[in-house]
């Protein structure tokens, strides 16, 4: 798993209680506003942006947050909100600029530091990601999502023992944090410790049996051990939950290593699995073209 829990979303929602509730909405043609009024209107816009973000209306939220940052340029929370929304809309470069501004105004804000770590990770600047995630964890050490992200950054730097250590810390903080359990399995499989990997994926599924990634990883590993019936059943179930796991690029994006990807290619090429993928693709095409007739 690359990223399952959005620290950015948590930071955005956390701002919801930080902005004062206002009954009025922004009046579009207000003349001669003084500094206090401008600040109030900026905070109203920021509050609206948070509310829109809660309903996943990110582009509308972003427009309001951009204006809010102009009206309240010295408010770290507004800049953090703007940076988070840029990340949410896959605009990483402006996200880093906004988050750096937030951090300059509030250096000890762990959520901002975590968000910067996430942003640098997306830019593939893994050393920078490690730096900012560790800074945030010095302030809030028991944050499982940040520990998980730090593990992923170490994974990308091929610092595997450190990655596993961070994943294990995340699970110690939150025993139900299945992505960290899953990723320990990914690493152990690459190390040739197949039985340990299988145990990790079974543990992840005991936490949430509806997660396709540990289900498919377990299927691939079991097939390699000759347990074909269970492997095919689990693999088909995983793909029916999320057919993207039938794409090798998607597996690689989610930190599947070379050894597991190699076995996954063989598994996904099996006639039964290919039949399932074709069926799912046809079903998806039918849903996207409901008015089309033969």
Locations of regions flagged by a protein language model:
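Helix-start (N-cap) detector for alpha-helical repeat units in TPR-like alpha-solenoids
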Residues: 35, 42, 76-77, 110-111, ...
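Alpha-helical segment of the N-proximal tetratricopeptide repeat
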Residues: 38-77, 81-91, 118, 122-125, ...
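Structural marker of alpha-solenoid helical repeat scaffolds
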Residues: 71, 105, 139, 173-174, ...
């Amino acid at each position: 798993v690359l990223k399952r829990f959005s620290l950015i979303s948590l930071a955005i929602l956390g701002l919801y209680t930080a902005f004062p509730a206002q009954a009025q909405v922004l009046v579009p043609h207000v003349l001669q506003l003084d500094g206090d009024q401008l600040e109030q209107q900026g905070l109203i816009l920021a509050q609206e942006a948070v509310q829109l973000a809660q309903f996943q209306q990110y582009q509308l939220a972003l427009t309001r947050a951009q204006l809010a940052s102009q009206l309240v340029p010295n408010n770290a929370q507004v800049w953090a909100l703007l940076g988070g929304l840029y990340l949410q809309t896959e605009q990483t470069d402006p996200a880093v600029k906004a988050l750096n501004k937030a951090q300059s105004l509030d250096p000890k804000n762990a959520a901002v530091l975590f968000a910067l770590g996430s942003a640098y990770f997306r830019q593939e600047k893994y050393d920078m990601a490690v730096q900012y995630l560790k800074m945030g964890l010095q302030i809030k050490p028991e944050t499982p999502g940040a520990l998980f992200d730090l593990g992923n950054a170490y994974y990308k730097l091929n610092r595997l023992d450190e990655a596993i250590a961070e994943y294990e810390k995340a699970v110690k903080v939150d025993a139900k944090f299945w992505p960290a359990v899953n990723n320990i399995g990914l690493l152990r499989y690459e190390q040739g410790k197949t039985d340990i990997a299988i145990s990790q994926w079974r543990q992840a599924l005991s936490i949430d049996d509806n997660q396709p990634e540990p289900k498919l990883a377990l299927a691939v590993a079991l097939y390699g051990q000759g347990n074909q019936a269970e492997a095919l059943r689990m693999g088909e179930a995983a793909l029916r939950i999320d057919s993207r796991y039938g794409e090798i690029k998607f597996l690689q994006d989610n930190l599947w290593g070379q050894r597991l990807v190699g076995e996954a290619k063989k598994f996904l090429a099996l006639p039964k699995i290919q039949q399932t993928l074709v069926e799912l693709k046809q079903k998806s095409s039918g849903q996207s073209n409901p008015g089309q007739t033969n």
